[in-house]
């Protein structure tokens, strides 16, 4: 493994990425802990901007932490109109363009790294819509907002490793609607149902961390024998 893959940037590096609506605020974080660094970069998308969603959301940061502890470099960013990102909320259309721009930057800067996508709530919908187009190698969807105001019918479903995590006690997303929608898909993702977990995983963040780490373990090379 090359030094560039193992250490793509300083930990918690603040970034400004050029986007279609102007500047995009982002943070690139190196793998941490004892897991060997992998040639993988995961972009993690945040929840609904109009309800306070940002790249600093606790579900987003815990997901990114779990990935880094698995040896994966993470890239979080603020959609347009959030934090230092320029522009204004565009109900998913412009936000998809933002993700395209961030992915293009990631591939230009780290061409040897496989691209994964992840998202929470609104961000999971944006990431799902982009996965096939961007040729992501894996996808993590947390609290997919099935049954809310966004269209899931016209999405080109990815044929890649796909982990879906859903709290059974979600008060924002109808968990049963999520499960029913997943049942209609020709390729079933790996589904982790978390009993008693709310939308924001209150008091369940460590369980979420474990679910992410367990879910992606099979996507990564096995560690060398001692």
Task: Give residue ranges: language-model regions.
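N-terminal cap/lid segment of alpha/beta-hydrolase-fold proteins
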Residues: 1-37
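Short beta-strand/loop motif that positions the catalytic acidic residue
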Residues: 158-159, 163-166, 170
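Catalytic histidine neighborhood in serine/cysteine hydrolases
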Residues: 184-200
């Amino acid at each position: 493994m090359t030094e560039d893959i193992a250490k793509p940037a300083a930990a918690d590096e603040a970034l400004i990425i050029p986007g279609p609506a102007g500047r995009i605020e982002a943070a690139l974080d190196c793998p941490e802990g004892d897991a060997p660094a992998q040639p993988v970069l995961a972009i993690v998308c945040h929840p609904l901007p109009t309800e306070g969603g940002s790249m600093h959301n606790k579900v987003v940061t815990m997901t990114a932490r779990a990935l880094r502890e698995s040896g994966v470099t993470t890239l979080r960013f603020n959609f347009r109109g959030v934090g230092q990102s320029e522009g204004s909320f565009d109900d998913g259309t412009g936000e998809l363009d933002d993700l395209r721009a961030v992915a293009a930057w990631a591939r230009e800067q780290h061409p040897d790294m496989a691209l994964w996508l992840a998202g929470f709530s609104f961000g999971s919908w944006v990431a799902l819509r982009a996965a096939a187009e961007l040729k992501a190698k894996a996808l993590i969807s947390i609290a997919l907002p099935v049954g809310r105001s966004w269209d899931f019918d016209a999405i080109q479903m990815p044929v890649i490793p796909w982990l879906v995590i859903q709290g059974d006690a979600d008060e924002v997303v109808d968990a049963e609607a999520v499960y029913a929608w997943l049942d209609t898909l020709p390729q079933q993702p790996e589904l982790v149902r978390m009993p008693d977990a709310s939308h924001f995983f209150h008091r369940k963040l460590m369980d979420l961390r474990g679910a992410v780490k367990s879910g992606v373990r099979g996507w990564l090379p096995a560690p060398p024998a001692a």
